[in-house]
From Swiss-Prot:
The gene is glmM. It catalyses: alpha-D-glucosamine 1-phosphate = D-glucosamine 6-phosphate. InterPro entries: A-D-PHexomutase_a/b/a-I, A-D-PHexomutase_a/b/a-I/II/III, A-D-PHexomutase_a/b/a-II, A-D-PHexomutase_a/b/a-III, A-D-PHexomutase_C, A-D-PHexomutase_C_sf, A-D-PHexomutase_CS, Alpha-D-phosphohexomutase_SF. GO terms for molecular function: magnesium ion binding; phosphoglucosamine mutase activity; phosphomannomutase activity. This is Phosphoglucosamine mutase. It comes from Pseudoalteromonas atlantica (strain T6c / ATCC BAA-1087).
Amino acid sequence: MSDRKYFGTDGIRGKVGENLINPEFVMKLGWAAGKVLAGSGTNKVIIGKDTRISGYMLESALESGLSAAGINIGLLGPMPTPAIAYLTKTFRSEAGIVISASHNPYYDNGIKFFSADGSKLDDDIELAIEAEMDKPMQCVASDKLGKAVRIADAAGRYIEFCKGNFPSNLSLKGLKIVVDCAHGATYHIAPNVLSELGAEVIEIGTEPDGLNINRKVGATSMKAIVDSVIKHKADLGFALDGDGDRIMLVDHHGNVIDGDQIVYIIARDALKSGKLKGGVVGTVMSNLGLEVALSTLGVPFERSKVGDRYVLELLRQKGWSIGGEGSGHVLNLDAASTGDGIVAGLQVLAAMLNANMTLNELSRGMTKFPQTLINVRFNEGDTPLDAQDVKNSVLEAESALGERGRVLLRKSGTEPLIRVMVEANDATDSRKWAEHIADAVRKATGQ
């Protein structure tokens, strides 16, 4: 496969107004995507966004480019990323487009695409779009231009979809749940789903102003929801990220339950009910404790590259359904075509009710190995992973840990970061060797 010029592991992402995330580029991207999609069926796409203020500007630019290529557009407004995947299928669209930078700050934004079946766009289609980007932009004839319409009932459709993934014989009545929507795209969705299923809902992170998405709230900033769960004596907490494709949970003691533990709980419930297809897929970053816990249950476990698109690819290759990442991307292909934070949370709630256990009790089935993750920022053009001192530091750590741990060093697919991960059966060793490697990376970048 050719190297990608614009698309990263999760679409196109960057700082608003710079490089790729500006009106001119995004209009051209819309046109190029329209050229690739044109003539393939309905000539219709849908566009949704999170709550960043730049979403309005980028939505208009995409709309203009797509229209120039003869594509009709359905505008969803603020909607979770998994909702756009689902609605792409239900509206029989050629593609769904998401304007979001997920868990990043408000000044970043991005564009990613879903195919007609609600899955991430294939690599060859992304490459075809990139090829069109290098051609001069030309409008179709005036009578062939696309039109845009606002879709009024999108939120209600998705709320019903979420509720449909919760067993009809179960109820959340009697449960007190804190839900943190990160001032993001789920702010008008998740509280309604939980309350309509019977829960008492306490909301935080549900007042977006265009600038506060992911700011000290949500799945990447857990203090707010931990404090709220304890303050309100809630049974558990849901923490979603800005676009709703990942979730972290909090038990009634205030312990954070991460994506690896969520995958374990969902897989265990599926196994107990006879619905587990084969095994489970994690990534090279998944905690060794997940692999050990699943092995105890007799469940096979495979690791993919980091990124939910690669988890999805391996699930499809294996014919399995359940997988995810520690960061809270959780997939269950029996329920949704992509990672869905709300649906994953509902599946954990169903597992609790089926087992008549608290979240804390369920999570004890998996013992996490101490894992230290350090992110080191690097400048464009630097190649710290090629530095001999960095390579030597990794070899030293691997030699010292032996079979008691593992080391992973990788470049982020979405940000200029080197991710240093060390896992060991002893927390002190994990921290010591992660710091050792991170120091070598910092020196290699001139820090």
